[in-house]
């Protein structure tokens, strides 16, 4: 189990840039990009101290000492793209989310010798949505993760290791009404 604790030697810094733009009637665009840095000032003992209980039980953890300085699950960059076109009673949307490389701790309780710190690849998720309004009713449909990006490594015994979709594209459709 994870217990979050402020260890007093971590720092986080970054810069965020964003732009929203309406280049023509019924069309909105937005872009957001963030560069992040999050590290501990020192290597974490559970990955770097040969005398720690974790390293005594699984000495291969010591190979990840340098990577343990990175804050787990904290991407080096993130970004979003939003495009929306709404002519009359129609609505079309395309959204995207970028996740940069990050370090993820994998702590296996069943097999501690497989514990490690994984550096992920950068990935992008894409979503679409189309809707048509008929008075107070609307019909809509769309897809999430339409290119079916999946994280390349899955460990069902450690929910904290999930950093990207573990299932492919999800498609949906529906009807809504306004009172």
What is each PLM-predicted segment?
Residues 1, 65, 112-114, 140:
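A generic, residue-level signal for flexible/boundary positions that often mark functional hotspots
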Residues 2-107, 176-178:
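Gram-negative outer-membrane beta-barrel transporters
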Residues 6-8, 68-71, 113-120, 161:
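Short, contiguous acidic/charged loop-to-helix segments that flank catalytic cores in large enzymes
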Residues 11-13, 75-79, 122-126, 167-171:
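Residues that define the transmembrane beta-barrel architecture of outer-membrane proteins
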Residues 17, 128-130:
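Short, basic/aromatic-rich helical patch in the C-terminal catalytic core of site-specific tyrosine
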Residues 86-87, 120, 133-134:
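Structural motif
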Residues 97-110, 131-179:
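C-terminal beta-signal and adjacent terminal beta-strands/loops
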Residues 119-123, 130, 164:
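Short amphipathic alpha-helix initiation/capping segments at coil-to-helix junctions
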């Amino acid at each position: 189990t994870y217990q979050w604790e402020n260890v007093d030697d971590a720092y986080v810094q970054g810069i965020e840039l964003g732009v929203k733009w309406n280049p023509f009637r019924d069309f909105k665009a937005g872009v957001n990009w963030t560069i992040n840095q999050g590290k501990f000032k020192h290597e974490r003992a559970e990955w770097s101290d040969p005398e720690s209980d974790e390293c005594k039980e699984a000495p291969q953890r010591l190979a990840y000492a340098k990577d343990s300085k990175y804050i787990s699950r904290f991407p080096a960059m993130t970004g979003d793209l939003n495009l929306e076109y709404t002519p009359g009673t129609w609505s079309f949307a395309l959204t995207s989310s970028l996740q940069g490389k990050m370090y993820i701790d994998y702590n296996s309780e069943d097999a501690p010798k497989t514990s490690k710190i994984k550096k992920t690849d950068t990935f992008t998720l894409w979503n679409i949505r189309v809707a048509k309004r008929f008075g107070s009713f609307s019909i809509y449909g769309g897809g999430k993760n339409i290119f079916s990006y999946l994280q390349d490594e899955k460990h069902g015994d450690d929910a904290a290791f999930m950093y990207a979709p573990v299932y492919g594209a999800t498609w949906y459709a529906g009807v809504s009404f306004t009172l």
